[in-house]
């Protein structure tokens, strides 16, 4: 926090930026990954609104790591006493996660995008990004601004 607190930060990604622009009219958009899974779930459990998981994909296409993460979120949320009406994509993501939950890194590593990232020397990034609950923060986008969520 000390590095970024009070500063404007400009970020661009190939897929995440497009997703954020597409969701700019949403009331708020929480940003999550395996790295902040537990923190994101705590925030979502406090939200009384409809929740939609928007996966960025890769170059406009489905990617395994997004589906695994969405499935992890759906799986955890469904274990609570909440009732959810799941879409087919939510059900499928959940099944994918349930099948691969003990080998997330290997599943991502063996995906098309995982092979690509390894081919350009970024396999260590895959391993890092498959870690669970490494950070206890949740970025939230409201309008065109991203800040840290202070809900939890």
Label each region the model flagged:
Residues 1-14, 22-28, 48, 64-152:
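Long, charged alpha-helical interface segments
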Residues 53, 59-66:
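Active-site-proximal helix/loop microenvironment
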Residues 30-42, 80-85:
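Short, acidic/small-residue loops that bind anionic groups at enzyme active sites
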Residues 18, 22-23, 38-44:
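Internal active-site segments that recognize and position negatively charged phosphoryl groups
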Residues 43-51:
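Glycine-rich phosphate/diphosphate-binding loops that line cofactor/substrate pockets in enzymes
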Residues 11-15, 33, 53-57:
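Short, structured patches in soluble enzyme cores that scaffold and shape functional sites
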